[in-house]
């Protein structure tokens, strides 16, 4: 039993390091995507979406989980919020700090595992994340942690997708394979291999997220499909979505 548990921990640790290594290699290209978004229509879209999700709250304390090069971090700081941002990848944090300086905002960045937060309970008014949970070995534990650090009445906003669900449902197939942008010579094969092995490749979302968040005691859970494909038979494939949950 002890040997099995140790083997599982070692496997998970190895996978986590593989994930970190890949995103370290992608940091420079990924920051190009983030800057394009911050200077384009995506910024306007997310400002509106976040404002609506907060329902008029001003200057809240925010945790950006898996911040990458800092798209949400910079955006929320420019909106006047107090932002703490974490990422497990050193190079992503380096790019995020550069972007915060470039756009003239103050953000508190820390290196941290999204599945094991180092903050006190009830610390934040808003926990926000984008394209992170699919990338985790223990997504349910991550949700528990994100909810733990939310204040009572706080809001969780998670933007994600069924990126590797084609592993489970062949209908998704090539229709939903992730389009990698600004690769800058980095091969996507490692993250595709990892993504296909992770738990979220076997769960249809946001239905799975709704169940988990309700089980965690969320007082309100809503989801909005932001990208989908309609098949000839009338069946709908959910590609991307945004989940809003209230603690």
Model-assigned labels for residue ranges:
Residues 115-126:
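A short acidic, Gly/Pro-enriched loop at the edge of an enzyme's catalytic core
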Residues 140-152:
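A short glycine-rich, Lys/Arg-flanked "PGG" loop and its adjoining helix->strand segment in the class I
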């Amino acid at each position: 039993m002890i040997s099995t548990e140790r083997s599982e921990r070692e496997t998970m640790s190895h996978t986590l390091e593989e994930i970190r290594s890949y995103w370290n290699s992608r940091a420079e290209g990924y920051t190009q995507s983030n800057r394009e978004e911050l200077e384009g229509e995506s910024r306007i879209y997310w400002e509106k979406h976040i404002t609506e999700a907060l329902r008029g709250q001003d200057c809240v304390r925010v945790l950006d989980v898996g911040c990458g090069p800092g798209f949400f971090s910079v955006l929320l700081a420019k909106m006047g919020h107090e932002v703490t941002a974490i990422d497990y990848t050193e190079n992503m944090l380096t790019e995020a700090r550069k972007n915060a300086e470039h756009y003239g905002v103050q953000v508190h960045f820390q290196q941290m595992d999204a599945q094991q937060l180092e903050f006190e309970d009830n610390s934040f008014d808003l926990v926000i994340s984008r394209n992170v949970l699919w990338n985790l070995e223990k997504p349910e534990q991550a949700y528990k942690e994100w909810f733990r650090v939310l204040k009572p009445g706080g809001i969780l906003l998670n933007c994600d997708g069924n990126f590797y669900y084609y592993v489970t449902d062949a209908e998704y197939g090539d229709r939903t394979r992730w389009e990698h942008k600004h690769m800058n010579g980095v091969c996507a094969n490692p993250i595709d291999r990892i993504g296909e092995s992770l738990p979220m490749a076997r769960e249809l979302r946001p239905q799975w997220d709704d169940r988990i968040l309700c089980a965690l005691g969320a007082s309100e859970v809503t989801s909005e499909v932001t990208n989908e494909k309609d098949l000839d038979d009338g069946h709908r494939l959910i590609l991307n979505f945004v989940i809003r949950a209230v603690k």
